[in-house]
Amino acid sequence: MIEVLLVTICFTVFPYQGSSIILESGNVNDYEVVYPQKVPALPKGGVQNPQPETKYEDTMQYEFHVNGEPVVLHLERNKGLFSEDYTETHYAPDGREITTSPPVQDHCYYHGYIQNEADSSAAISACDGLKGHFKHRGETYFIEPLKLSNSESHAIYKDEHVEKEDEIPKICGVTQTTSESDEPIEKISQLTNTPEQDRYLQVKKYIELYVVVDNRMYRNYNSNRDAINERVYEMVNTLNVMYRPLNFFIALIGLEIWSNQDEINIEPEVAVTLRSFGEWRNTTLLPRKRNDNAQLLTGIDFNGATVGLAYVGTLCRPTQSVAVIQDHSKRTSMVASTMAHELGHNLGINHDSASCNCNAGPCIMSATISNQPLSEFSSCSVQEHQRYLLRVRPQCILNKPLSTDIVTPPVCGNYFVERGEECDCGSPQDCQDACCNAATCKLQHDCDSGECCEQCKFKKAGAECRAAKDDCDLPESCTGQSAECPTDSFQRNGHPCQNNQGYCYNGKCPIMTNQCIALKGPGVNVSPDECFTLKQNDPECGFCRIENGTKIPCAEKDKMCGKLLCQEGNATCICFPTTDDPDYGMVEPGTKCGDGKVCINRQCVDVQTAY
């Protein structure tokens, strides 16, 4: 029996108060020096399947002192960092595309926490010494190896002691999108979700992320693909820590380096680059590599102080589930924070208003990118994110990677169901699952969990496992052959819903009033029909689509299918500003625009012929 090895390292600490040193993060004015000394710890319970010897342990612990106090940093390998079909792509000098599937099972990127501290977290690379950050007593500390010959010394320091690379505030290029005032947010927070909505929000969600590095950034790192790979791995590892509070798990499914030349025109005008990258994802990337979201890291200096841009509320869309980020700092944590910010826009989160705040430090969705990395989501962002998920329900985030898709050597007894295992309830001493054989990680009977599993056996065929949640949903029943409830199914498109106020469309009942509430908060209604007539030729509120930058007015019959108009108090004809997201503030597809008619492609057509 091979047991999981826990490693404890003791650090001798020598504070260097007031001294200065140049590290990878830049010039650090105050730091402590520690010398790791590896000490084997007592074996931990758990049964490990036979496997080849690995360079890095799955679980490690480090003991050291911070400000003279001993702490224990617990680390676990980020098992979800790479998807099984993770690939790396670069280009030969003659332009040939070269794609490989490198072995990433034995990687060196970890998440963790300080022992006995509930609010702690860590993201660490252990590839060549210890590099990353950890949160201790509400403060963030950074650690990295000191490049001294014949020495295992490391530096520990705070962000406040790192000299800023420049004093110019960095900004996001998304404009005219700000979280609503406190009043709507408070009203929303007081609303009670249905049990089905609560279940949906609590389900783990997954994003398979594809990262592209442009030619400028490649050359900025001396055309060293290994250096870029390590930098991107660190960024995505950190990105995961930031998104765990939202119950999102991000797996890197591909990394592409434009080593020969850029595959699109990358311009200083960030909106142009974003549009080109979205088109490239749709026409070139998706046909050869599946992904839920793609981000472009570029070495170009965007116009002004802008360092990133993304579409808002567009996750899973072929041309718009994208973001572009300037590699604006030597510090991976700073760029990772910008990646988190732009991904937040894709997830329907707008910029925080002045009334939004975070428990500690800056907020991720502040319009100004903070000089302090590793920020967190505000309560405003959480509310907006949940509202977006419940309104749009993007499907690509629910396809959890199979147990074979998350790459790691299988360990029976570590509570993770991995390749070759049917269940994993911990060690035989700890297992509380009567359906699982802890010694073999095999099921005793049919199943151990799932909506269609009862007392370790499949429920009989026909047993309802998911009730219809509304007029546009259908109930699901167990098949008798699986522990999982069948995939959610919906009423046919065009089925009347909500007392004939609308027609079902892709499992939802799109009604203009609900769309107004989603954008403005409770107490808002759709404008009267005369508003749509009055605003028909208004350049801001009366168009149906934008072609080559020109707003095309709606035809008379289609006036209810263009810009959404809402009523709030005495304001009867409110429309929403045009943003980089072409669908923001527009009437949703499938919305009822008359008796027996629905909006499709911004046109009001007969429901019988629409689907």
From Swiss-Prot:
<dbReference type="InterPro" id="IPR006586">
    <property type="entry name" value="ADAM_Cys-rich"/>
</dbReference>
<feature type="disulfide bond">
    <location>
        <begin position="544"/>
        <end position="554"/>
    </location>
</feature>
<feature type="binding site">
    <location>
        <position position="421"/>
    </location>
    <ligand>
        <name>Ca(2+) 2</name>
    </ligand>
</feature>
<keyword id="KW-0482">Metalloprotease</keyword>
<feature type="domain" description="Disintegrin">
    <location>
        <begin position="409"/>
        <end position="493"/>
    </location>
</feature>
<feature type="disulfide bond">
    <location>
        <begin position="412"/>
        <end position="441"/>
    </location>
</feature>
<feature type="disulfide bond">
    <location>
        <begin position="472"/>
        <end position="504"/>
    </location>
</feature>
<feature type="disulfide bond">
    <location>
        <begin position="425"/>
        <end position="431"/>
    </location>
</feature>
<dbReference type="GO" id="GO:0005576">
    <property type="term" value="C:extracellular region"/>
</dbReference>
<feature type="binding site">
    <location>
        <position position="414"/>
    </location>
    <ligand>
        <name>Ca(2+) 2</name>
    </ligand>
</feature>
<comment type="similarity">
    <text>Belongs to the venom metalloproteinase (M12B) family. P-III subfamily.</text>
</comment>
<keyword id="KW-0862">Zinc</keyword>
<keyword id="KW-0865">Zymogen</keyword>
<feature type="binding site">
    <location>
        <position position="208"/>
    </location>
    <ligand>
        <name>Ca(2+) 1</name>
    </ligand>
</feature>
<dbReference type="InterPro" id="IPR001762">
    <property type="entry name" value="Disintegrin_dom"/>
</dbReference>
<comment type="function">
    <text>Snake venom zinc metalloproteinase that may impair hemostasis in the prey.</text>
</comment>
<feature type="disulfide bond">
    <location>
        <begin position="435"/>
        <end position="456"/>
    </location>
</feature>
<feature type="binding site">
    <location>
        <position position="473"/>
    </location>
    <ligand>
        <name>Ca(2+) 3</name>
    </ligand>
</feature>
<keyword id="KW-0732">Signal</keyword>
<feature type="binding site">
    <location>
        <position position="418"/>
    </location>
    <ligand>
        <name>Ca(2+) 2</name>
    </ligand>
</feature>
<keyword id="KW-0479">Metal-binding</keyword>
<feature type="binding site">
    <location>
        <position position="488"/>
    </location>
    <ligand>
        <name>Ca(2+) 3</name>
    </ligand>
</feature>
<keyword id="KW-0964">Secreted</keyword>
<dbReference type="InterPro" id="IPR001590">
    <property type="entry name" value="Peptidase_M12B"/>
</dbReference>
<dbReference type="Pfam" id="PF08516">
    <property type="entry name" value="ADAM_CR"/>
</dbReference>
<protein>
    <recommendedName>
        <fullName>Zinc metalloproteinase-disintegrin-like MTP9</fullName>
        <ecNumber>3.4.24.-</ecNumber>
    </recommendedName>
</protein>
<feature type="binding site">
    <location>
        <position position="476"/>
    </location>
    <ligand>
        <name>Ca(2+) 3</name>
    </ligand>
</feature>
<feature type="binding site">
    <location>
        <position position="399"/>
    </location>
    <ligand>
        <name>Ca(2+) 1</name>
    </ligand>
</feature>
<comment type="subunit">
    <text>Monomer.</text>
</comment>
<dbReference type="InterPro" id="IPR024079">
    <property type="entry name" value="MetalloPept_cat_dom_sf"/>
</dbReference>
<keyword id="KW-0106">Calcium</keyword>
<feature type="short sequence motif" description="D/ECD-tripeptide">
    <location>
        <begin position="471"/>
        <end position="473"/>
    </location>
</feature>
<feature type="binding site">
    <location>
        <position position="345"/>
    </location>
    <ligand>
        <name>Zn(2+)</name>
    </ligand>
</feature>
<dbReference type="Pfam" id="PF01562">
    <property type="entry name" value="Pep_M12B_propep"/>
</dbReference>
<feature type="disulfide bond">
    <location>
        <begin position="452"/>
        <end position="478"/>
    </location>
</feature>
<feature type="disulfide bond">
    <location>
        <begin position="531"/>
        <end position="573"/>
    </location>
</feature>
<feature type="disulfide bond">
    <location>
        <begin position="447"/>
        <end position="453"/>
    </location>
</feature>
<dbReference type="InterPro" id="IPR036436">
    <property type="entry name" value="Disintegrin_dom_sf"/>
</dbReference>
<feature type="disulfide bond">
    <location>
        <begin position="541"/>
        <end position="575"/>
    </location>
</feature>
<feature type="binding site">
    <location>
        <position position="424"/>
    </location>
    <ligand>
        <name>Ca(2+) 2</name>
    </ligand>
</feature>
<feature type="binding site">
    <location>
        <position position="416"/>
    </location>
    <ligand>
        <name>Ca(2+) 2</name>
    </ligand>
</feature>
<feature type="binding site">
    <location>
        <position position="396"/>
    </location>
    <ligand>
        <name>Ca(2+) 1</name>
    </ligand>
</feature>
